[in-house]
Amino acid sequence: MKTADPLLKNEYSKRVYARLGLRRPFTVQQETRHYRMPVLQEHGGHVVLRSGPEIPSTEWTNLEYSTPPTDPTTWFAPLATATGENILQGFWDFGKPDLDGIWTSNADRAPGLVRYVDSMGGRFGRIQIIRQEPTSIREARWGLHLDDNNRLNPMANGWVVRLWFQLTDDPDSSLVLRRGQFDRANEVRVPLRRGTQVLVDSEALFHSGCHKGPDRRYALIVSLESTDHLDGWVRSQLP
C-alpha cells in the first residue's frame, strides 16, 4: 500500500480520503457477550494506572525490530506472537484469536518485561515493543485508528484489551485517545512519562501516539484477556 505524502497527513485530508473511499473504514465494535471489565467501563474505556516497574534499557534496545511498509517511522520488536517467531502478523492469519501468545527469541533478552507480563496472571496475546521516531500531533491525528483484537475471539472468552507501558521518559509526548475518529473536542492526551501504564479498550477508542522527540520513544504494548482477575490487578495498580 502506498503511503500518503507527510504533508497530507492531517485529519482534514483524512476526512476527504474517507469520503472518497481511499481509506478503509474502521469497524466500530458491536455489543457482544464477551466479559468486559467493570474497571474499564467505569473509566470510559481507558484507565491510567500508577507507574510501573523499572526496566533496564538493554531490554528494549538490543532486540530485533521490523517495520510495516505503511509506516516507516514506527518499528516493532515482537515479544510474543501467534507462532513464537519474530513476525508482524495478526493471530487471525493463523486461525487464532489474539490470545495464548508464544514468547519469541526477543523475550529471552527482556526477562524483566516477561516477569512484568507474567505478574498480571492472565492470558495474553500479541506483545510487542514499539519504537517511534518523532511524530507531530498532526500526524498522530492522521494515524488515529481502532484495533481488531477480538477477531475470532469466542464469546466464552473475555474481551481482549491492550495495555501500554511507557519505557522511555517522554513527558511532552502523549497517547492520543478519542471516542469518535474526528471528535477533537473530547480528545484525551495521556502524557508518556517513564513508567506510565494505560489500559485501553482499543476497539472502542481511536488511538495514536504523538512523540515530540528528539530521541526515539519506546513502549511495551500487550494484548490481554478481560477477566475478573485482571480487573482486580488493574484496581491494585490505580493511583
Tell me the role of every PLM-derived stretch:
Residues 1-128:
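Non-heme Fe(II)/2-oxoglutarate
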Residues 4, 18, 77-82, 107-110, ...:
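A sequence-composition feature that detects small, non-aromatic residues
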Residues 16, 28, 39, 47-48, ...:
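Extended aliphatic helical segments
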Residues 52, 66, 79-82, 132, ...:
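Structured loops at beta-to-helix junctions and adjacent beta-edge loops in soluble globular domains
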Residues 113-115, 151, 206:
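Residue-level detector of functional hotspots within protein domains
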Residues 117-197:
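Catalytic core of non-heme Fe(II) oxygenases with the double-stranded beta-helix
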Residues 174-239:
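Catalytic core of Fe(II)/2-oxoglutarate
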